[in-house]
Amino acid sequence: MKGKFIVIEGLEGAGKSTAVNTVQQFLRHFKIQDVICTREPGGTALSEEIRHLIKKKSQNEEILTDKAELLLLYAARVQLLENIIKPALSSGTWVIGDRHDLSSQAYQGGGRGIKSEFIKSLADFTLGSSFRPDLTLYLDLPPELGLQRARKRGHLDRIEQQSLVFFERIRARYLELTYDDPRIKMIDASKPIKKVTVDIQNALLSLLEK
């Protein structure tokens, strides 16, 4: 039996890492032991190098352009997809992804203002138009709360240092995409962790019952 692909999405500080652990524990409770976790950008040796390029602040005067950022993200994504995710799913392993294609639609589309049609065509070319996660959990919260949480973790990377308005645009695009796709379930990540955990578990139950 083919594995399932579950993706966790959200702004900085939304609690994606905690949600990944919640999903993994829930699947184990239902005797689903063959599970791997991935992150984007990253997940392969080459993709991790690309992650470093995207996340770090430039040490010289060269600025990473918005289009270059988008192309790097899809290069990292297709490496992860073809080398890790697809083989795992084909072998019956479940995959829990910390971010996937929806991030680029929200961050580069909503945040950077790159046309959604171009991002879709790039996604179709690199990932294939028929490949989609079985379930995406979008952890929604106000950007100011997410950034407050992110600052408590310590040093902010290049993306996390963007303006509040940037993250407001991202959230708006996330919400727009969520309403348009029944496979994306919105979780209110501003609520207490116990409530967030229950909401995630309920969304997973719906997937398992299909």
From Swiss-Prot:
Record GO terms (molecular function): ATP binding; dTMP kinase activity
Catalysed reactions listed for this entry: dTMP + ATP = dTDP + ADP
- Annotated CDD domains: TMPK
Q: What's any GO biological process attached to this entry?
A: dTTP biosynthetic process
Which residues participate in ATP binding? G10, L11, E12, G13, A14, G15, K16, S17
Alphabetic keyword roster = ATP-binding, Kinase, Nucleotide biosynthesis, Nucleotide-binding, Transferase
Q: Listed GO cellular component terms?
A: cytosol
E.C. number? 2.7.4.9
What Pfam families does the record point to? Thymidylate_kin
Q: Which residues form the signal peptide?
A: none
Summarizing the function annotation, the protein's role is: Phosphorylation of dTMP to form dTDP in both de novo and salvage pathways of dTTP synthesis.
Sequence similarity: Belongs to the thymidylate kinase family.
Return the HAMAP family for the record. Answer: Thymidylate_kinase
Protein name per UniProt: Thymidylate kinase
Q: Which organism is it from?
A: Hamiltonella defensa subsp. Acyrthosiphon pisum (strain 5AT)
Q: Which gene is transcribed and translated to give this protein? A: tmk
